[in-house]
Amino acid sequence: MKKIMIVDDDVTSVAIVKALLEPEFEVVSANTGVEALGELQRSPDLNLILLDMVMPGVSGMYLLKVLKKSENWSNISVIFLTSLEGVDIELEGFTNGASDFLQKPVNAELLRLKIKRQLFIQDLKAENQHLQKTLQTLHSRIDQVFNEVLP
């Protein structure tokens, strides 16, 4: 089962999104950026983060920058959940590595579709990496055989 973390200081929003996702996904939550970093330490198998942009202390944008600079967490997809509007906000988010945006209040069907799309993209990336490694191994083996046959 895929694992998703919701990071939002609004406890009601967390509860609503969690209820929408739990039948299909394992869901953990954090109410601050600092709590999110702690949860990341405990849950290295996270697949996706739903991240509020505006939180006290550590903002969602700052947390995104930390995640994308980390070797351990840079591949986790991040979808911003925000009440902020404007192209500048989205440009900053995408520039810093956000996977997508979703406007609050969240539409349940759109949320599920965006999550599934990001998880599908992750699966394709993982398959691509596996195929690249297999291809490199085969290429090395072919080189080895050629060197044995044609000294």
Model-derived features: positions:
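C-terminal output/effector regions of signal-responsive regulators
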Residues: 126, 130-151
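Acidic, metal-coordinating helix/loop segments flanking the phosphotransfer/catalytic sites
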Residues: 29-48
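Receiver (REC) domain active-site loop signature in two-component systems and cognate sites
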Residues: 55, 93
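C-terminal output helix
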Residues: 89, 105-115
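The feature encodes the CheY-like receiver
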Residues: 14, 56-57, 74, 82, ...
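Two-component/phosphorelay signaling modules centered on CheY-like receiver
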Residues: 11-29
